[in-house]
């Protein structure tokens, strides 16, 4: 799939290059006929106060670290009357520096050499009564697990590789009405360091395929305001329905060495209004309902149940919280609200609230409530400013039952030195804390704080 996308981008660039000569100046990008190619690269340093997201206890101390970061990116945009095409591809390298080679910690085991992301968007006949739409996102992302003393020759990163594809037909019976009949396909692969697994073999922890239909409707009853509706049905199928309960031993927990991870079917329906209500005020409000139903038989039929004796002893399909747990009625309530206000040109404030649920990797599902406040500003088109504060509560259900509080605070700034070069700095505070009374006893190790900062330069042709 990745190869096919690369070939498609190459063919598009080649065809445009043949049809028209390239013309560009530094900061003006590369122009090939109607297409614009934008190469860019960011390089800088990044520092963390808690690289491995540890709880800071005697057994798992916080480890500070600094890394060199390199992020090249290539963008391609074609804006035509019959075809609109966008392609963005980026790569991320992160090399940690060990300033204290004599101690017991190895920050180089958190090096990241395989991070990348590709975004593709294609619209065919965007103004016709019948059109076609395709969107695809592919990424590979790693982050450090709680393994500060693992030898540097072995990676301590947990890695997720995912691809989400959405494609289908757009129908426009009138200038104000549009429907979309789409299909979605998602693939997720999860890899963990082999030191976290007790069973010999691969570091592939689990994989998931999800697919199903998506139907949307939009009625533009005012020039900049629309009524919107959405329905989706999703089939979620896991490679392994019996997985190891990786991580530290949790005293007082009823979780054994294995966890049931059942397949599921999920559906959602929501509707609302979105638009620009005044020159300074834009808003979106959608409410709905959904459910996720889990198939416990998929766990009982897993080959591991018959071959691993301890797994058989741990299986239990009775009780309020097991791998047979489906979403509750209250967890099925969906809310998505956003209000954006721009008091003066170049400055905007956005406040939002989202309530939803999603399938989880290590238990059945997580229901979450998230509220955020965001500021974006620009001064004289040279100085860019940003700030964001968000608070999210996660409630996990299944064999693993816990509640987390997630607090994120970010600030950022950038200065445009020339048309093709800019400097940037950012800082963030990431905090996760237990939200249940017994968290300090059972899930203390899931809590952490991490202060991080980045200083770098971006060059764009």
Q: In which residue ranges do the predicted regions lie?
A:
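Bacterial N-terminal signal peptides that target proteins for export
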Residues: 1-10
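Exposed boundary/loop context
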Residues: 2, 17, 26-27
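Gram-negative and organellar
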Residues: 24-461
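Bacterial N-terminal signal peptides
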Residues: 9-19
């Amino acid at each position: 799939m990745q190869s096919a996308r690369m070939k498609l981008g190459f063919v598009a660039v080649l065809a445009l290059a043949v049809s028209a000569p390239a013309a560009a100046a530094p900061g003006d990008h590369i122009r090939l006929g109607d297409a614009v190619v934008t190469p860019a690269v960011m390089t800088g340093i990044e520092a963390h106060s808690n690289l491995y997201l540890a709880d800071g206890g005697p057994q798992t101390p916080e480890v500070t670290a600094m890394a060199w970061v390199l992020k090249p990116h290539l963008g391609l945009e074609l804006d035509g009357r019959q075809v609109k095409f966008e392609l963005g591809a980026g790569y991320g390298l992160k090399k940690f520096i060990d300033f204290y080679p004599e101690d017991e910690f190895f920050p180089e085991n958190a090096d990241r050499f395989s991070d990348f992301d590709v975004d593709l968007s294609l619209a065919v006949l965007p103004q016709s009564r019948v059109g076609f739409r395709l969107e695809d996102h592919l990424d590979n992302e790693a982050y450090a697990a709680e393994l500060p003393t693992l030898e540097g020759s072995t990676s301590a990163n947990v890695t997720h590789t995912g691809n989400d594809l959405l494609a289908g037909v757009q129908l426009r019976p009138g200038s104000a009405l549009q429907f979309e009949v789409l299909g979605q396909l998602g693939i997720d692969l999860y890899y963990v360091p082999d030191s976290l697994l007790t069973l010999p073999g691969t570091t592939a922890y689990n994989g998931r395929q999800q697919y199903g239909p998506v139907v949307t409707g939009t009625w533009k009853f005012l020039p900049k305001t629309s009524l919107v509706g959405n329905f989706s049905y999703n089939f979620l199928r896991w490679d392994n329905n019996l997985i190891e309960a990786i991580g530290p031993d949790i005293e007082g927990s009823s979780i054994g060495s294995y966890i049931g991870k059942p397949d599921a079917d999920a559906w959602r329906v929501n509707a609302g209004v979105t638009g620009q209500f005044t020159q300074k005020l834009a808003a979106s409000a959608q409410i709905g309902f959904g459910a996720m139903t889990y198939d416990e038989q998929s766990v009982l039929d897993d080959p591991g149940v018959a071959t691993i004796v301890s797994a058989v002893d741990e299986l239990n399909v009775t009780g309020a919280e097991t791998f047979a747990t489906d979403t509750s009625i209250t967890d099925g309530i969906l809310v998505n609200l956003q209000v954006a206000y721009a008091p003066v040109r170049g400055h905007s404030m956005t406040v939002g609230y989202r309530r939803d649920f999603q399938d989880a990797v290590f238990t059945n599902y997580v229901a979450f409530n998230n509220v955020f406040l965001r500021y974006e500003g620009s001064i004289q088109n040279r100085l860019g400013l940003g700030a964001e504060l968000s608070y999210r509560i996660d409630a996990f259900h299944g064999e693993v039952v816990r509640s987390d509080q997630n607090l994120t605070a970010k600030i950022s700034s950038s200065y445009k030195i020339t048309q093709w070069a800019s400097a940037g700095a950012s800082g963030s505070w990431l905090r996760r804390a237990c939200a249940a009374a017994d968290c300090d006893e059972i899930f203390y190790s899931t809590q952490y704080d991490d202060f991080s900062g980045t200083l770098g330069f971006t060059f764009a042709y």
